[in-house]
């Protein structure tokens, strides 16, 4: 069955709910004390995993649209990318406020040097920031051919973000490995484009 614009509109509503409802759960979990004895870590991990899931979902759209012969699915990609940026921003803010605290934000630079996995995370966030700012149609028209070159940097985020996660947990636990494998598989779908981008 070929998806119609009406189907895509309904799908977008569901995707918005998928991006928003976990935020309500997070707020409720904090309010009700459902997290472990280290809620700051739990919040950081939850927001980080949400950002990573949405990044993978964003990368999944193109293969689904191409191989599933559903070109209208591409219209969902920007929505997922913006939700990914939203959760990545929550992840960064939760680290800055809960780990460092308002009184110690000046230590962030020192933290980035002493903990390289943080550097990877911040680089990923800066790329996502650039992609979010330039995602509207008006920016696409202004940037012209440079727009696609800029947005190809999402592939770099797909490499850096799983490494950031693996490195931050400091153990070879299954979950970050699965995220890394999923990112690798999605990048393999773009092997030719990815190779051209690095030339």
Curated annotation (Swiss-Prot):
Subcellular location: Cell inner membrane
Transmembrane helix among keywords: yes
A cellular-component GO term for this protein: plasma membrane
Gene Ontology terms for molecular function: electron transfer activity; FMN binding; heme binding; metal ion binding; oxidoreductase activity, acting on diphenols and related substances as donors
Membrane topology per record: Multi-pass membrane protein
N-terminal signal peptide: none
Main location: membrane
Parts of the chain that traverse the membrane: 13-33, 79-99, 120-140, 147-167, 169-189
Cofactor or coenzyme needed: FMN; heme b
GO biological process terms on file: protein repair
Cofactor: binding comment: Binds 1 FMN per subunit. Binds 1 heme b (iron(II)-protoporphyrin IX) group per subunit.
UniProt keyword annotations, A-Z: Cell inner membrane, Cell membrane, Electron transport, Flavoprotein, FMN, Heme, Iron, Membrane, Metal-binding, Transmembrane, Transmembrane helix, Transport
Family label: Belongs to the MsrQ family.
The protein's assembly and partners: Heterodimer of a catalytic subunit (MsrP) and a heme-binding subunit (MsrQ).
Function noted in UniProt: Part of the MsrPQ system that repairs oxidized periplasmic proteins containing methionine sulfoxide residues (Met-O), using respiratory chain electrons. Thus protects these proteins from oxidative-stress damage caused by reactive species of oxygen and chlorine generated by the host defense mechanisms. MsrPQ is essential for the maintenance of envelope integrity under bleach stress, rescuing a wide series of structurally unrelated periplasmic proteins from methionine oxidation.
Protein name per its UniProtKB record: Protein-methionine-sulfoxide reductase heme-binding subunit MsrQ
Upper taxonomic lineage: Bacteria, Pseudomonadati, Pseudomonadota, Gammaproteobacteria, Enterobacterales
